[in-house]
């Protein structure tokens, strides 16, 4: 994980440098660094960087103790994968931690068409061609697979292939690539149970309303460790040749990303 984290920061910082407008200076060691004039950046609120994410804010993407208005974790802590990425980008753009403002943006709202209240959103949002028609994405900061979570001791827990998943009721959050994977690849005989939030989908599995939950792999680890007792990751699904990856989301045409 440490090597992956280093790579993600490199990708995030490379994106940030692109938004700086090219101002640079040479150090005594002969290396060139990029600096930003915050006044030249196209920001929602002058003088501060506004970052959106959903609430609750879950590990491993966010850390720190719960603090209002945030539930479970606190994006402002700088702890957790996505919080650290956001602050690394902010630092490269010339913002101190105190100049970063976090706002609550529901998952499906983040990549919907129209004006945005954030400069960028970080919330495990996978790049898809359809989404890229209405919002802009940064380069990948995390490559991901989809996974399936089941309760131990259930019939579906013995499944060993995608074909064996077809008879079961699968739960998933609406608007996600997890939902798209179910439709395009698993193609179950029963309509999947679709929920507005991942919390609701998790609760359905926990309460026995669904047989399994499809989510991205890091989320699956959190679900099995902290949310659904006596559950396990049944397996992870292979991705397409191009793979699935998360990117920072921007309003379409935002000059911060190009």
What are these model-derived regions, one by one?
Residues 98-164:
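Acidic, polar ligand-binding/catalytic clefts
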Residues 142-150, 218, 225-258:
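Periplasmic-binding protein-like
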Residues 31-121:
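Extracytoplasmic small-molecule ligand-binding "clamshell" domains
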Residues 89, 113-115, 165, 204-206, ...:
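Hydrophobic residues within well-ordered alpha-helices
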Residues 17-31:
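Bacterial lipoprotein signal-peptidase II cleavage site
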Residues 109, 125-134, 183-184, 206, ...:
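A ligand-binding cleft/hinge motif common to bilobed small-molecule-binding domains
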Residues 1-18:
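Sec-dependent bacterial lipoprotein signal peptides
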Residues 85-87, 92, 154, 169, ...:
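Extended ligand-binding regions for polar small-molecule ligands
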